[in-house]
């Protein structure tokens, strides 16, 4: 799973 900052930079989304 790779976590990356969202467009707004508020939270980190997890994508795997």
Curated annotation (Swiss-Prot):
It is found in: Secreted. Expressed by the skin glands. Keywords: Amidation, Amphibian defense peptide, Secreted. GO terms for biological process: defense response. Disulfide bonds: none annotated. The keyword Secreted applies. The lineage of its organism: Eukaryota, Metazoa, Chordata, Craniata, Vertebrata. Has no antimicrobial activity. Does not inhibit the formation of NO by neuronal nitric oxide synthase. This is Riparin-5.1. The modification Glycine amide is found at residue 16.
């Amino acid at each position: 799973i790779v976590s990356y900052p969202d467009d707004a930079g508020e939270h980190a989304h997890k994508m795997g």
